[in-house]
Amino acid sequence: MGQFISFMQEIPIFLQEALNIALVAVSLICIVKGLVNLYRCGLFQLMVFLVLAGRSCSEETFKIGMHTQFQEVSLSLSALLTNQSHELPMLCLANKTHLYLKSGRSSFKINIDSVTVLTRSADVFVHSPKLGSCFESDEEWVVAWWIEAIGHRWDQDPGLLCRNKTKTEGKLIQINISRADGNVHYGWRLKNGLDHIYRGREEPCFEGEQCLIKIQPEDWPTDCKADHTNTFRFLSRSQKSIAVGRTLKAFFSWSLTDPLGNVPPGGYCLEKWMLVASELKCFGNTAIAKCNQNHDSEFCDMLRLFDYNKNAIKTLNEETKTRVNVLSHTINALISDNLLMKNKIRELMSVPYCNYTRFWYVNHTLSGQHSLPRCWMIRNNSYLNSSEFRNEWILESDFLISEMLSKEYSERQGRTPITLVDICFWSTVFFTSTLFLHLIGFPTHEHIRGEGCPLPHRLNSMGGCRCGKYLPLKKPTIWHRRH
């Protein structure tokens, strides 16, 4: 009884929705049936062939289905590598020989040659990351971080020479990487480190000759552009520990904030000031949840890198510089080593790989829902044509529609009263019963045996027309169900 009363109270709510759905369903069935019939006649196929034969299709918008389109989003890292203090380092390779390093407002030039500038008798000898006598405080940690990234170990490797920062000649640090005598293993290790973070550089030193690295402050050249892939390599090279499994730790929980630190509603928005070059695109909390569940997407790595940079700037501005060492210890929780290694192997094998810049996704134009962006692969320094991975974005659209239908089905199940389900069940039983009666069949009219049906005239027992139009034929009649 209580269930029936609850059902009666909910009638105004679900009847309004059910009635509208019923009316729309009837209309759609009629329209779809008519279109299907028209489609089966072949007229549409002929018109489409005559219009499109010999013409090229536009690539501006790819329509996968009726309401799904293939779209893309481009990420700009100009805000990530901005001119602020204590930011992520940015590396540049100019003309394959000039190496540069920049972090915050400090920039450095790295020269590699055989000319000795500093001597142990006249300059400072350092064997620890404390370079306060060589550089200012905002430059010291950057240089020490870079030296560790190329493979130098302070507690095991030879010391370095640097010029006292009070001298008028300028700040300078000198590292001996000559691959000769007892220094050969150390030299090879640092050379490999340079090759790792500066891909494509030319080696100016030869085996057995003197080779020195000189680091000195210098203005950032205008022809150097931000290359976040070098930053990725730098971070992965300078990590202190490697975890076998990659899971997002509590320290790197998502911080959905704007540039001022305010929490915006509706999810993580990649705004013009931060990522998207041409427009605003918001990726809701659903995409964030997918990234937290599955750590196997280049797009998720990019978002984690942005979030890490914001947290690092806030932490370093409020606390001491020693916090950088703690952050670098846990940097491996940000970037998936498996993805980096996989993309590098693809690059070496000349197969498509990801450079973490351009991503594509499938967008549903009616509901605004979209799939999790996936990396747009590169081959031979150019992005793949969208037709080359057509199966991937068609499959992604199928997954998106399946996810939407599953979510809609769950919501409708929650809004459907149990009594309505009972009514639907008994109405189905009633329909099955009437269908059984329809299959048995009942006679609908009477006509002369062996001859055509005289409808709309009715016959009498003599085989004549009751209205008198036809004379009695004295022929047997029979009841028939079909005209």
Swiss-Prot record:
Zn(2+) 1 binds at C57, H457, C465, C467. Zn(2+) 2 binds at H445, H447, C453, H483. The keyword Zinc applies. The record marks K33 as: Important for GP-C-mediated membrane fusion. The keyword Zinc applies. InterPro entries: Arena_glycoprot (IPR001535), Arena_glycoprot_zinc-bd (IPR043015). GO terms for cellular component: host cell endoplasmic reticulum membrane; host cell Golgi membrane; host cell plasma membrane; membrane; viral envelope; virion membrane. The chain crosses the membrane at residues 18-32, 34-53, 423-443. Pfam families: Arena_glycoprot. Signal peptide: none annotated. GO terms for biological process: fusion of virus membrane with host endosome membrane; receptor-mediated endocytosis of virus by host cell; virion attachment to host cell. GO terms for molecular function: metal ion binding. A lipid is attached at G2 (N-myristoyl glycine). The record marks S58, E59, K249, A250 as: Cleavage. Residues 33, 444-483 are cytoplasmic. Disulfide bonds join C92-C224, C134-C162, C205-C211, C269-C282, C291-C300, C354-C375. It comes from the Viruses. Keywords: Disulfide bond, Fusion of virus membrane with host endosomal membrane, Fusion of virus membrane with host membrane, Glycoprotein, Host cell membrane, Host endoplasmic reticulum, Host Golgi apparatus, Host membrane, Host-virus interaction, Lipoprotein, Membrane, Metal-binding, Myristate, Transmembrane, Transmembrane helix, Viral attachment to host cell, Viral envelope protein, Viral penetration into host cytoplasm, Virion, Virus endocytosis by host, Virus entry into host cell, Zinc. Glycans are attached at N83, N95, N164, N176, N355, N363, N380, N385. Residues 2-17, 54-58, 59-422 are extracellular. Stable signal peptide (SSP): cleaved and functions as a signal peptide. In addition, it is also retained as the third component of the GP complex. The SSP is required for efficient glycoprotein expression, post-translational maturation cleavage of GP1 and GP2, glycoprotein transport to the cell surface plasma membrane, formation of infectious virus particles, and acid pH-dependent glycoprotein-mediated cell fusion. The cytoplasmic domain of GP2 plays a role in ER location. It also contains a zinc-binding domain that allows SSP retention in the GPC complex by accepting a cysteine from SSP as the fourth ligand. Belongs to the arenaviridae GPC protein family. This is Pre-glycoprotein polyprotein GP complex. It comes from Tacaribe virus (strain V5) (TCRV).
